[in-house]
Swiss-Prot record:
It is found in: Cytoplasm; Nucleus. The gene is SUGT1. Its main location: cytoplasm. GO terms for cellular component: cytosol; kinetochore; nuclear body; protein-containing complex; ubiquitin ligase complex. Residues 276-365 form the SGS domain. The keyword Nucleus applies. The CS domain mediates interaction with HSP90. SMART domains: TPR. This is Protein SGT1 homolog. Keywords: Acetylation, Cytoplasm, Isopeptide bond, Nucleus, Phosphoprotein, Repeat, TPR repeat, Ubl conjugation, Ubl conjugation pathway. It comes from Homo sapiens. Probably associates with SCF (SKP1-CUL1-F-box protein) complex through interaction with SKP1. Interacts with S100A6. Interacts with HSP90. The modification Phosphothreonine is found at T265, T284. SUPFAM superfamilies: HSP20-like chaperones, TPR-like. The modification Phosphoserine is found at S281, S331.
């Protein structure tokens, strides 16, 4: 009975104020009571703001930022909610968003310069981990709750993360090749979602921004050697790479991909390079020529026995007319491979019977 009375008293105390001090004492209990309070008053901006604080103390930053945003929707001038939104973004390592939030909050709070976020918030301001329950009584100074302090921390964190991103970006490679009508750039980035890729084309510039699976941003900006047609240029996101196709206005061969201020002499595609495999490598190979050499070798190769006979049939079929090919196909299929005729006027009128060689017997399996 006494326990029930104590619980009722605690509930009434929370409902009366939901102050930071009371929340500091028992964040989980405060969270439950605030949730009940919001069921009765779903449009109370302060309740959302204080519930965000409960979630912050419990380390639930993703949920906390949602409550802080809801509080700001209901009361855009609530700088405490702005501060708590920024704290969540900071601890989720979304430093750019946190910096923007703190800067906006500083404008709202220009008169006072700081806000109290609760006695248990000290460790949250200085650590990426939620505080232990036995340390929630630590005090917080005005400096720790100052928007300016948070802005500085975000800037320092951004500078550190940018250097890490630069190191990571330096490991990302891209390659390019060209055809007569387009230049194709391949970014060697795996497992990227299409919504996380933004590519912008201009006449002589390409800009690509990719949100990597790690959460970092990859930037590629190229000043192109020759003009392109932006509206006909496209990109495709695949599981193993990102493929960017730049449309050429004319069949000009690019000597290199980038050109900074230089005016290159256009070189037209000519017949002797038409069937070269497109590549940025200085070494090229004419595949038509290679195929021709292989065919010539096969033609001059001396075969014996069945191999020579098969070569003869292949040559007859390759050089034959449509009627010859039809006759060979029909006779071979209907006779079970025992007859091969080139006379369509004969085999076209009848079914070709099975006729094995004299020393062999036909068996059906």
């Amino acid at each position: 009975m006494a326990a029930a009375a104590a619980g009722t008293a605690t509930s009434q105390r929370f409902f009366q104020s939901f102050s930071d001090a009371l929340i500091d004492e028992d964040p989980q209990a405060a969270l439950e009571e605030l949730t009940k309070a919001l069921e009765q008053k779903p449009d109370d901006a302060q309740y959302y703001c204080q519930r965000a604080y409960c979630h912050i103390l419990l380390g639930n930053y993703c949920v906390a930022v949602a409550d802080a945003k809801k509080s700001l929707e209901l009361n855009p001038n609530n700088s405490t909610a702005m501060l708590r939104k920024g704290i969540c973004e900071y601890h989720e390592k979304n430093y750019a968003a946190a910096l923007e939030t703190f800067t906006e909050g500083q404008k709202l709070d220009i008169e006072t310069g700081f806000h109290r976020v609760g006695q248990a918030g000290l460790q949250l301001l200085t650590s990426s981990d939620p505080p232990a329950l036995d340390s929630q009584s630590a005090g917080i100074t005005g400096a720790d709750a100052n928007f300016s302090v948070w802005i500085k921390r975000c800037q320092e964190a951004q500078n550190g993360s940018e250097s890490e991103v630069w190191t990571h970006q330096s490991k990302i490679k891209y390659d390019w090749y060209q055809t007569e009508s387009q230049v194709v750039i391949t970014l060697m980035i795996k497992n990227v979602q299409k919504n996380d890729v933004n590519v912008e084309f201009s006449e002589k510039e390409l800009s690509a921004l990719v949100k990597l699976p790690s959460g970092e941003d990859y930037n590629l900006k190229l000043e192109l050697l020759h003009p392109i047609i932006p509206e006909q240029s496209t990109f495709k996101v695949l599981s193993t790479k990102i493929e960017i196709k730049l449309k050429k206005p004319e069949a000009v061969r690019w000597e290199k991909l980038e050109g900074q201020g230089d005016v290159p002499t256009p070189k037209q595609f000519v017949a002797d390079v038409k069937n070269l495999y497109p590549s940025s490598s200085p070494y090229t190979r004419n595949w038509d020529k290679l195929v021709g050499e292989i065919k010539e070798e096969e033609k001059n190769e001396k075969l014996e026995g069945d191999a020579a006979l098969n070569r003869l049939f292949q040559q007859i079929y390759s050089d034959g007319s449509d009627e010859v090919k039809r006759a060979m196909n029909k006779s071979f299929m209907e006779s079970g491979g025992t007859v091969l005729s080139t006379n369509w006027s004969d085999v076209g009128k009848r079914k070709v019977e099975i006729n094995p060689p004299d020393d062999m017997e036909w068996k059906k399996y």
